[in-house]
């Protein structure tokens, strides 16, 4: 019985991992879109609210994605192994770090690159997971894309 529940949790974490990865990719894609028909030609979706909305639209309804509340607010630095302290403590929730041009304090739209990192905390339903120290499984998805411009 526990083996079946553990297998179900493994399938669930795989499912949510794929959903979070797709959300990061779609959010970055949203921020890179260039509309040549706009007057003047520009990227009308290159802001934090639109990028976050794109990420939220790609995850299941039981997943909560928000912008982080503390520093760093947009760009994560260092190796991903050092980001452990930035994961949300609430189960089945994630923080979306949206980094325009590698600048944590940038207020305007990205001109070169957009990086979207999603740090997601998955909570297994199997009580056996707590025995092996997996009360929360941390899932990371990261995507960097080049901002489109008029050639």
Q: Model-derived features: where do they sit?
A:
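Alpha-helical transmembrane segments
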Residues: 12-22
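N-terminal single-pass transmembrane signal-anchor helix
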Residues: 1-12
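Short, conserved structural patches
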Residues: 17, 25-151
